[in-house]
Amino acid sequence: MDGNVQEELELEKSIRRFREKFHGKVTLETAVALMRRFTNNHDQVCKYIILCMDNDTDLDVRNDLRNDPVARNVINKIKSDDQKAKEMPKDKDIKDLAKRMNTLPLTEKNLKMFNDAAENRIPSRDRQFACKECDFVWWRRVPQRKEVSRCHRCRKKFDPVPENKMWGIAEYHCPVCRRMFRGFGQIEVSSPCYVCRNPVLPSCILPPRRNQGPRTRNTHSCLAENCYNRRVPFVAGLQCAHPKSRIMNQLPKVLHPSEPHISTGSTIATCLSQGSLTENDIDDIILDDIKEEEEDEGSDDSDG
């Protein structure tokens, strides 16, 4: 970056922060002159204002700025930005929108919307998606208002897998022995507790994450009819979620495909880049800054 441009950028940032400290009560020219004089040192500038400011300063300030091209460029830019800011609220569309917002009932939902907007926050959830055509399963962090993701193999958009049909690494809480355990499973399909053998329904399906906890050597088992380690009694028609059972029975990875997404014309972004899930094998060491996770599990028994 050019030296003068970098100098102007640093000066502009310092001036804007400095004027904000005093709620804009310091004139722009005075702020620029002081920041130039004290090399952007806020403490010294504040002391100067408190101890040394008098009625003759304005004339001295203008004289200081006449031969300072960097300062003049910053003054002109900030003045231009300030003028744009003053003109913006006059926009009829903005006024109409603000008026409509003011007429909304103060419900809990609307209050949360205003609070989220004020804090530049988009509520999101981690959801599972599955493309039947590509036999591809992935997780995506999506806005709650528009839960949709695109299969990056066929490029078609899908709604998430229904919450009562999700499968993958499940978390179980046994009501008998009070033990919590994890293993491959699916919602509404019981697996026996590894300690007391009591059938337990999963409380949730976990998105793939790094460091999901210690791995166990317990062998997977569930009440599905085609489980490779089936327990008796089993439930006819239930499908086992474990990859080993899927491979042994020559079944696709996708247990319950996502429905194709029908667009409503919303302009809200369908994916969030911050804090998104990763795209890799679920059993691998995975990176935190990639957006998706392909659920392509191995057939190792060690994770339940």
From Swiss-Prot:
A motif (Nuclear localization signal) lies at residues 140-156. The keyword Cytoplasm applies. InterPro entries: SHFL. Keywords: Cytoplasm, Nucleus, RNA-binding. GO terms for biological process: negative regulation of translational frameshifting; regulation of translational termination; response to interferon-beta; viral translational frameshifting. Its main location: cytoplasm. One of its GO terms (molecular function) is RNA binding. Pfam families: UPF0515 (PF15135). A motif (Nuclear export signal) lies at residues 278-287. Inhibits programmed -1 ribosomal frameshifting (-1PRF) of a variety of mRNAs from viruses and cellular genes. Interacts with the -1PRF signal of target mRNA and translating ribosomes and causes premature translation termination at the frameshifting site. May exhibit antiviral activity. Belongs to the SHFL family. This is Shiftless antiviral inhibitor of ribosomal frameshifting protein homolog.
